[in-house]
């Protein structure tokens, strides 16, 4: 192990785990799912984030409240960070460099909290490498919990002795140095767009995270993944890493602790269900791009026209549409109202995905989004934007459970015609039937409670095995 001597012995005493996810709801939610699972098993969690983000989280189930302590730490004021911004959803991505500074400004408060609460473990996110020396000063071991699969880590952090050069072609192409064959890659425009997206035009600053420290200085490396999804990638990572690599499973909807009765009685769900009940089985395409992805007007327009041209029934969750900033094509909702719904507030996604009328999904390929959709056996039409989303899209294509909308190699633009063709291919065309069958088979794996309960138990066993007795 890195700089602490872990005992390597099993210990059945309840754990106390401090969690420090990044200031993004797409990171906070999967951390909170782990927190609830730990609490359900009788362990204690101190969950740390900003006040606004904690208020945005789902309520802790009543029976778990004694086990989960939510700690609100106010962010310091940072020049150029908009007033009230506490999450990536509050700002354009080019302002993330200032959100990072605010996050790092929590170090004193986190240090004080760890000293007084003395947890057995700190589970930290990629952006919280700064917590490692703090925790180790109190003899508390650290586990990095990566909410994305192993292929992201392996692809973007290749061994230096395996890279012939660091040209754009070398960085973006399929890794030739792996002991197995893969076709996954990123496109040059995707890499350049991601790089440019980190720069604040006003100050010239970029968001730069010490990923090497976050990955290499932990005592356990935890990932939201499974061998069934990426066994080769996990084997490679485990064989080339100096600390134990532990998949925690996919945390699929069947494992999540939710208030089902409250969801069933939600008025929005009742209205949506009434509409879905009128649709034919496996006929509706569910379209959702998460709460944080900000489409350009050009992309939104082409996407809407493509959905219309497909002539498929659809449910489009478009919560982050800002009236007056982004607009659907004139007359779109009127022309499609007989076969589709544009839902502009929060949508009960899991309830919708479980309905028999859903025949497939269109997704940006965020990890959580993919897991939820494939869990229900749905084929995916992908339109990724961020680098991790692009890789996940290519992995799913490689496994033949998804098809990506064709895009220009120059700038990533796409056409309404290609959107329509891709949707029809995946959802209704005979040529796409193999994809649909493959997705159903993968859904059986993703939804297996027996399988994922074992991953959870192995994860907890690892925390028990490598805890430090004096930290309890």
UniProtKB/Swiss-Prot annotation:
Keywords noted in UniProt: Glycosyltransferase, Transferase
Pfam family, one: UDPGT
Keyword NAD belongs to the record: no
Binding locations of UDP-beta-L-rhamnose: 291, 347, 364, 368-369, 372
Alphabetized Gene3D superfamilies for the sequence: Glycogen Phosphorylase B
Taxonomy, superkingdom: Eukaryota
CDD domains hit by this protein: GT1_Gtf-like (cd03784)
Residues bound to an anthocyanidin: 27
An example Gene Ontology molecular-function term: soyasaponin III rhamnosyltransferase activity
Function: Glycosyltransferase that transfers a rhamnosyl group from UDP-rhamnose to soyasaponin III in the biosynthetic pathway for soyasaponins.
Protein name in the entry: Soyasaponin III rhamnosyltransferase
Species of origin: Glycine max (Soybean)
């Amino acid at each position: 192990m890195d700089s602490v001597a872990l005992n390597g012995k099993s210990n059945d005493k309840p754990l106390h785990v401090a969690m420090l996810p990044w200031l993004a709801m797409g990171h906070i939610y999967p951390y909170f799912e782990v927190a609830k699972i730990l609490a359900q098993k009788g362990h204690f969690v101190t969950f740390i984030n900003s006040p606004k983000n904690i208020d945005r989280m789902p309520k802790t189930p009543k029976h778990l409240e004694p086990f989960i302590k939510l700690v609100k730490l106010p962010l310091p004021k940072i020049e150029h960070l908009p007033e009230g911004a506490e999450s990536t959803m509050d700002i354009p991505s080019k302002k993330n460099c200032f959100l990072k500074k605010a996050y790092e400004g929590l170090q004193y408060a986190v240090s004080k909290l760890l000293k007084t609460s003395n947890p057995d473990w700190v589970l930290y996110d990629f952006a919280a490498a700064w917590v490692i020396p703090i925790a180790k000063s109190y003899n508390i071991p650290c586990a990095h919990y990566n909410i994305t699969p192993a292929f992201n880590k392996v692809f973007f952090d290749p061994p230096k002795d395996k890279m012939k050069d660091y040209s754009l072609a070398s960085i973006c192409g399929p890794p030739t140095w792996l002991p197995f064959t893969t076709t996954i890659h990123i496109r040059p425009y995707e890499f350049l767009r991601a790089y440019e997206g980190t720069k604040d035009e006003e100050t010239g600053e970029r968001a730069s995270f010490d990923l090497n420290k976050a990955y290499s200085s932990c005592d356990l490396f935890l990932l939201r993944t499974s061998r069934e999804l990426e066994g080769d990638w996990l084997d490679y990572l485990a064989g080339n890493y100096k600390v134990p690599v532990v998949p925690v499973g996919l945390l699929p909807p069947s494992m999540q602790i939710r208030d089902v009765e409250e969801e069933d009685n939600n008025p929005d769900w009742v209205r949506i269900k009434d509409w879905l009940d009128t649709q034919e089985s496996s006929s509706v395409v569910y379209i959702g791009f998460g709460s944080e992805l900000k489409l350009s007007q050009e992309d939104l327009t082409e996407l809407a026209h493509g959905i219309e041209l497909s002539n498929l029934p659809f449910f489009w969750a478009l919560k982050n549409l800002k009236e007056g900033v982004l607009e659907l094509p004139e007359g779109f909702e009127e022309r499609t109202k007989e076969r589709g719904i544009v839902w502009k507030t929060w949508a009960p996604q899991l309830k919708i995905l479980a309905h028999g009328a859903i025949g497939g999904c269109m997704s940006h390929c965020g990890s959580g989004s993919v897991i939820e959709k494939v869990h229900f056996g749905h084929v995916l039409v992908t339109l990724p934007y961020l680098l991790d989303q692009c890789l996940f899209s290519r992995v799913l294509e490689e496994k033949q459970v998804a098809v990506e909308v064709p895009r220009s190699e120059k700038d990533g633009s796409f056409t309404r015609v290609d959107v329509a063709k891709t949707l029809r291919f995946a959802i209704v065309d005979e040529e796409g039937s193999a994809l649909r069958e493959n997705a159903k088979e993968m859904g059986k794996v993703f939804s297996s409670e027996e399988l994922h309960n074992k991953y959870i138990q192995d994860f907890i066993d690892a925390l028990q095995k490598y805890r430090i007795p004096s930290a309890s």
